[in-house]
Amino acid sequence: MVVQDAETAADCALELQRSFSELPLADLGLPQTLGLRLGGHFGPVFPLYDPVLNQMAFMGSHVSRTARIEPVTPEGTVYVTDAFAAALAVPRQPRFICNYMGVVPAAKDYGSMRMFALSRRSSTRSE
């Protein structure tokens, strides 16, 4: 998914994670251990028409980088890159917390990236 800003992407990722966690997995015939992994990166992408799928798509190195995050993210978590975390830190009243998780090897031998676990900032928390 491509959105215009990091805050919208963070809201979307955390809402997807919350919604998934509330699914009645057993009622749906799914294993209780099933979890969702989400990854995010912030950078320019290039729209282009995909003639195979007959629709618009996005391409570029930042799309490839993002695709290498999800496979190494623990289930039930949203991992984001340092570029994404930095974009979220810009507002005067940041709504999100990005906890540094270390340098994590990316999927498919893409190298290593500094990863952050994304969460919402509690409205009662004073910092």
PLM segments and residue spans:
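Catalytic beta-strand-to-alpha-helix segment of the class III nucleotidyl cyclase homology domain
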Residues: 2-123
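Short, charged, solvent-exposed linker or helix-capping segments at domain edges/interfaces
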Residues: 125-127
